[in-house]
Amino acid sequence: MRTTLLDTMAVLRSCFRPELLSRRAAERILDGRGSVVFSMVSLWEIGIKMARSGYPDLELPADWDERIVAGFAEQGIAMIGIEVKHCKMVENLPMHHQDPFDRMIFAQALQRDFSLVSSDLDAPLYLDEVIW
């Protein structure tokens, strides 16, 4: 089974509102048959959005960052970083989607041949395996 990358909303839902995950997404994250990872890009995106207006539907705690990292570490879900090759790949992606965080996550999934857990309707325009 391919490694699975979680997009930012999948990270947030997994950690703070798992009932908002689709059944397929929850199964992929929890089934233990394949490796699951999340991106440092998600922490960056959450930090910027929290500084602006937050996520009113999710009511994140002040220590959201520590809870995400520690919670995923307990589950064996690793964090991946941003590499130069991911930055270069963003340049070559079609402009179907404008959000820079999502574009970087798409590039990471493409470059590493990961499947992606995402409810983003544009994700299938970039990736061949999107789970939701």
What annotation goes with each model-predicted range?
Residues 10, 42-43, 86, 105, ...:
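Alpha-helix capping/helix-boundary segments
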Residues 40-48:
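Short, conserved active-site loops that position catalytic residues or coordinate cofactors/metal ions
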Residues 5, 49-50, 116:
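Hydrophobic recognition helices of helix-based DNA-binding modules
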Residues 8-9, 46, 90, 109:
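Generic structural signal for small/hydrophobic residues in well-ordered secondary structure
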Residues 127-132:
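Active-site regions of enzymes building and remodeling cell-envelope glycoconjugates
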Residues 1-38, 54-70, 112, 121, ...:
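Short, well-structured N-terminal submotif of metal-dependent ribonuclease cores
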Residues 59, 73-119:
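Active-site neighborhoods of divalent-metal-dependent phosphate/nucleic-acid chemistry enzymes
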